[in-house]
């Protein structure tokens, strides 16, 4: 990197450390040319599994980041993974918060429900890779009930997208962990056997187990952002 770029990159870790009181490591730098910003994938020492985006203005060296929303999403993902595990469903999820307000909260120990309420999280998008090649009615029912319960606990609507993977499961999970945004193509190039979608709106699931199984499709790809329309 040239000197100015290096200074910009250094500004990210310095600024984040001052803001959150942790040390941070840049994993990847992007958008070097043609924009006023430099974007980086960053992890913290305290939560190395949470990869998030930070942007620095080349001129002013001002840094913005989405560390806290990724951290809160990670905690929701952990809870979902644990809850599904109780039904012997092995999974890993990527959680995206759709926030109305973006308060500059720096408390990394903040309660999940409180964070969602304060930031006006109406909806949460969940992408889940499931380590299985088929799903029966009981499993589909357990899955829907688990997501429904989580929606009630956090008082928020969910848009849920599931992928059945077998051979590529571990490498897909590693890609999901290393990529901050769900808009990144971490799902590309994997052998997805089936995909399915459902929503939780105001405490009601849009599909029951049978409907979910009937709607499973091996070809229903499409852009990840457009699949719930």
For each predicted feature, which ranges?
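Short, non-transmembrane alpha-helical segments in secretory-pathway proteins
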Residues: 1-27, 76-86, 144
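Extracytoplasmic/periplasmic, Sec-exported soluble proteins
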Residues: 4, 8, 68, 72, ...
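Exposed beta-strand-loop-beta-strand "reactive/processing" segments of non-cytosolic proteins
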Residues: 23-56
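Surface-exposed beta-loop interaction hotspot
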Residues: 65-125
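Extended amphipathic alpha-helical interaction segments
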Residues: 100-148, 152, 156-160
């Amino acid at each position: 990197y040239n000197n100015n770029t290096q200074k910009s990159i250094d500004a990210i870790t310095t600024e984040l450390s001052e803001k959150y009181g942790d040390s941070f490591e840049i994993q990847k730098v992007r958008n070097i040319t043609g924009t006023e910003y430099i974007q980086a994938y960053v992890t913290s020492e305290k939560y190395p599994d949470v990869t998030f985006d930070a942007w620095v203005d080349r001129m002013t060296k001002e840094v913005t980041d989405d560390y806290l929303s990724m951290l809160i999403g990670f905690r929701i993902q952990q809870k979902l993974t644990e809850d599904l595990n109780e039904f012997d469903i092995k999974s890993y999820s990527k959680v995206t918060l759709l926030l109305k307000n973006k308060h500059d909260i720096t408390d990394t120990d903040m309660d999940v429900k409180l964070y969602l309420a304060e930031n006006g999280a109406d909806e949460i998008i969940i992408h889940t890779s499931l380590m299985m090649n088929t799903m029966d009615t009981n499993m589909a029912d357990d899955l829907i009930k688990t997501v429904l319960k989580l929606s009630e606990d956090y008082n928020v609507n969910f848009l849920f997208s599931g992928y059945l993977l077998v051979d590529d499961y571990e490498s897909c999970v590693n890609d999901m962990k290393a990529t901050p945004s769900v808009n990144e193509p971490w799902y590309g190039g994997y052998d997805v056997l089936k995909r399915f979608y459902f929503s939780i709106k105001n405490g009601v699931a849009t599909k029951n187990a049978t409907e979910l199984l009937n709607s499973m499709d091996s070809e229903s790809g499409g852009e990840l952002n457009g699949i719930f329309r």
